[in-house]
Design a protein with these regions (language model features):
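Short basic helix-loop element that most often maps to the first helix and adjoining turn
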Residues: 7-26
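Helix-turn-helix/winged-helix DNA-binding modules
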Residues: 15, 41-44, 55
Length: 76
């Protein structure tokens, strides 16, 4: 099983210098929810990912980790 994080929210937040508290305020979410997302304990819904991308001014693809094997499987 692959133990790589499923999302890159923490990375993008660090690049934008946005804290969990700040992102939570932007999205109207509890900081505990943001913490679960950035630690990959749980994953945001697609709707939440879209909101996160808007708040962080990035593409939704910047927030999602896909390795080459996943991409190749999806091309079949």
């Amino acid at each position: 099983m692959n133990n790589k994080p499923l999302n890159r929210i923490k990375v993008v937040m660090a690049e934008r210098m946005v804290s969990n508290k700040e992102l939570g305020e932007m999205l109207g979410k509890d900081t505990a929810t943001i913490s679960r997302w950035v630690t990959n304990t749980s994953q945001p819904t697609l709707e939440s990912l879209i909101e996160i991308a808007k708040a962080l001014k990035c593409d939704i693809g910047d927030l999602v980790r896909m390795d080459d094997s996943t991409i190749l499987k999806n091309q079949d």
